[in-house]
Amino acid sequence: MEFVEFSEVSETTKTSSLPQGHEWTVQVPAGSKLTVIVKYGIAEILGTELANDVPYTFQGVIVNIYAIERSMIEWKCLEELEPKVSENKSYHAYIYNLNFALERLRLSSFNGPRVLIVGNASTGKSSLAQMLCSYALKIRHYQPLLVNLNPQDGVFSLPGSITATPISELLDVESSIWGQSITTGATKLHNKQPLVKNYGLENIRDNRPLYLSTITQLASGVQQRLKNDPIVRRSGVIIDTPKLSHLDTEDWSEVGHMIEQFDINAIVVCAESDDLAIELSEVFRTKIGSIVRIPPPGSIIAIDDIMRRALQRVQIREYFYGTTETVLSPYTMGAGFEELTVFRPRNISEYGEDKKDVDLTVFDKIEVNSSNLQHAIIAITNISRKESQDKLNTASIIGYGLITEVNDSKKKLRVLLPVPSRIPDRAMILTEYRYLE
């Protein structure tokens, strides 16, 4: 008999030296874990400074470490990664100048800047939004309101939602959703409390009226927060938007709606040339005081559909289970079919030639069964399931659940919840997102 020997796969620690103004960039596969330690120097991830000799762990994300001064990092990963180091000093000079310009606006008025960031895919929009919030915290005791209007990204919530979150402390650089909201376990950083509105569909084109309605509801909550909180009002609002290919760029209806609802006074265009900034200045010349262009950073890694799906899966898992450093303990609860009332948003692709006569902002009640709900993500609203269906349009989201098992014969199902609770007696909205453990 022959015995087969299995060689143990070990992680080899590698080092990278980063000159001042250079950025270390790597894409971490979803199934791999990268650990990074800054040995000396000052380095940051999207505006958040990394402590020396502290391990940071990343899974399924793109990591960008920028050296403010000469730095040395140690890193290890079982997967063979190919990080690249590029000079990025000029890009950060743009960011610093923009940050100082926003600070002047904060000092000149009790109403802080309201910035809308627009651009095509892979131009650094989301990274810019995160950096502007992080840099604001370094200047004074600000609490900028970070707004995400891209339903394909999970920001302090799950994909399918749009959110508004006051940022009062450091963002969690290890988290794929930028940090934890109210969760079931202890976290290293202060939990954020986002205002969450559910869109539920994957693509904006599938229901533009519902998307605009959802923006209106989120903006209403934002305006109320700004009215009641002078610190947040003076700190300003930083808004990240979907990539332009998902928006109507013929008459700019969605961008115009965002400008109107959030009282935008500045637009930041992430683009290689001035063409987009010039077009927007012509369309919105009477509404916007200033439009500036920021060129994309040279360290951008394009996110394709496969990576987007993998990242969304990481975000869903992290919402329920936490990160490798902050493990959460979700709860699985059983329930009968009769205990759930579930609605779903309408999709324009289902209506064919009759779509002009359909109210796409209405939600349809669905049957509770395995074909509809198996492995589905559901949004739990703040309204009773006995309330009028009309109130769904203005409902906020108190959390999300994952339907892990549906038994049609016994009319029973199991729901994974992030907090210990019975099945909430609330109306629920089915999203298009699924997660199979």
From Swiss-Prot:
Keywords for this protein: ATP-binding, mRNA processing, Nucleotide-binding, Nucleus
Q: Name one GO biological process term.
A: tRNA splicing, via endonucleolytic cleavage and ligation
What Pfam families does the record point to?
Clp1, CLP1_N, CLP1_P
What SUPFAM superfamilies does the record point to? P-loop containing nucleoside triphosphate hydrolases
**Domain of life of the organism encoding this protein:** Eukaryota
Entry's Gene Ontology molecular function annotations: ATP binding; polynucleotide 5'-hydroxyl-kinase activity
What compartments host this protein? Nucleus
Instruction: Identify the GO cellular component terms for this protein.
Output: mRNA cleavage factor complex
| Cited Gene3D superfamilies | Clp1, DNA binding domain (2.60.120.1030), P-loop containing nucleotide triphosphate hydrolases (3.40.50.300), Pre-mRNA cleavage complex subunit Clp1, C-terminal domain (2.40.30.330)
- Which residues participate in ATP binding? E23, S122, T123, G124, K125, S126, S127
The UniProt entry, under InterPro entries, shows: Clp1, Clp1/Grc3, Clp1_C, Clp1_C_sf, Clp1_N, Clp1_N_sf, CLP1_P, P-loop_NTPase
Family membership, please give it. Answer: Belongs to the Clp1 family. Clp1 subfamily.
Looking up PANTHER family in the UniProt record yields:
CLEAVAGE/POLYADENYLATION FACTOR IA SUBUNIT CLP1P, POLYRIBONUCLEOTIDE 5'-HYDROXYL-KINASE CLP1
HAMAP family (UniProt xref)? Clp1
**Function comment:** Required for endonucleolytic cleavage during polyadenylation-dependent pre-mRNA 3'-end formation.
Q: How does it assemble?
A: Component of a pre-mRNA cleavage factor complex. Interacts directly with PCF11.
Q: What is this protein called?
A: mRNA cleavage and polyadenylation factor CLP1
**What is the protein's species of origin?**
Kluyveromyces lactis (strain ATCC 8585 / CBS 2359 / DSM 70799 / NBRC 1267 / NRRL Y-1140 / WM37) (Yeast)
Task: List the top taxonomic levels of the source.
Answer: Eukaryota, Fungi, Dikarya, Ascomycota, Saccharomycotina
